[in-house]
Regions:
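Active-site bordering "gate/hinge" segments
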Residues: 1-200
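Long, well-ordered mid-to-C-terminal structural blocks that present hydrophobic/aromatic surfaces
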Residues: 194-214
Length: 214
């Protein structure tokens, strides 16, 4: 998949990207009708897009987003979905650089099973985990913060204003209409809310390997 994407970014022109996006629109049209349960599985190379110029593709995506947005809005919170990851050799070598490729792959596989809480009693583990996250979200809602401030000895100094009447949510989501509960990300450790895009000021320093657009 990464290799196909590389060829696309390297060789496909802006006008062709616009044509290809019509296929994505057709797919979204059908998704809004059937609202399928979706499982997204990733196993990509963290450095897969190093040195690749994606400007043509990004420009096409930005231009066509207003067309796509109506479909995203139509489906929002109406269907169940989950994103999870499978190990790849490239990813495994990044995480376990001192091990042989097959051993690194096995270690990453075991780490994913553990962090996604499916190595033992998965249903019990997730019920307990979701309950804990929901309790933390409840506490944050009771505090009703105006802003969040992050400071660290590594140089991070960031202030983020929150939207008025914001609400903290956690791993458990419920579909609109059908009222089906689901967890969208595996793993997930987050509680989250809505910041103000005009109220972010400061600097963030990454202390871990960071993959940004490959």
């Amino acid at each position: 998949c990464d290799n196909i994407s590389k060829l696309t970014f390297k060789n496909v022109k802006y006008e062709t990207h616009l044509e290809n996006i019509k296929m994505d629109e057709y797919k979204l049209q059908n998704m809004t009708k059937i609202l399928p349960v979706s499982i997204y599985v990733e196993d990509s190379d963290p450095d897969g897009f190093n040195g690749i110029d994606m400007s043509e593709s990004i420009r096409a995506q930005v231009e066509t987003y207003p067309i796509m947005k109506k479909y995203f809005d139509e489906m929002e919170n109406k269907y169940q979905w989950v994103i999870c990851a499978m190990p790849s050799m490239e990813w495994a070598k990044k995480v376990f650089p001192n091990d042989k490729p097959k051993e690194a792959f096995k270690k990453l596989e075991e780490a994913i099973l553990k962090t996604t809480r499916i190595d033992k009693d998965a249903i019990k583990n997730w019920k307990e985990h979701v309950k804990e996250l929901q309790e933390k979200a409840k506490i944050l809602n009771e505090y009703n913060f105006d802003y969040l401030e992050y400071k660290s000895s590594n140089g991070t100094d960031l202030k983020i204003k929150l939207m008025p009447n914001h609400s903290w949510l956690s791993a458990r989501e419920t579909t609109l209409g059908s009222n089906v509960e689901f967890t969208a990300n595996m793993p997930t450790e987050e509680v989250f809310t809505m910041p103000s895009y005009e109220g972010v000021d400061g600097l963030v320093v990454s202390t871990k390997p960071l993959s940004f657009r490959g």
